[in-house]
């Protein structure tokens, strides 16, 4: 794994979600990529999306690239409908961990 990278797995639906768990990773020094594995997120509501958007804003402020992988159909639809896919950038949605890690390596500091 690239030394500049943090990987966090979100488990379960993102309803009434809080950002505290994965935002804690943004305090690590010398890290400029946060990869979120979302394979085990079958569903997301607006509060889950707001949590993800808050994480994205925090990452932007700290110069951290946010990458997502294994995003399921329903959460992806919520993200698309709300404009989050466009905001984050389609290129930051990765098919699997190998693709995400390879992309993270291009941001090595």
List the predicted regions and their residue ranges.
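Structured cytosolic domains appended to multi-pass membrane proteins
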Residues: 1-109
């Amino acid at each position: 794994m690239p030394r500049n990278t943090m990987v966090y797995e979100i488990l379960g639906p993102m309803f009434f979600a809080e950002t505290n768990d994965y935002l804690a990773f943004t305090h690590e020094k010398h890290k400029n990529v946060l990869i979120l594995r979302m394979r085990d997120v079958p569903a997301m509501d607006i509060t889950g999306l707001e949590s993800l958007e808050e994480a994205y804003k925090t990452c932007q402020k700290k110069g951290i690239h946010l990458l997502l992988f294994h995003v399921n159909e329903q959460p992806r639809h919520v993200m698309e409908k709300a404009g989050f896919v466009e905001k984050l950038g389609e290129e930051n949605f990765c098919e699997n961990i190998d693709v995400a890690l390879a992309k993270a390596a291009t941001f090595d500091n």
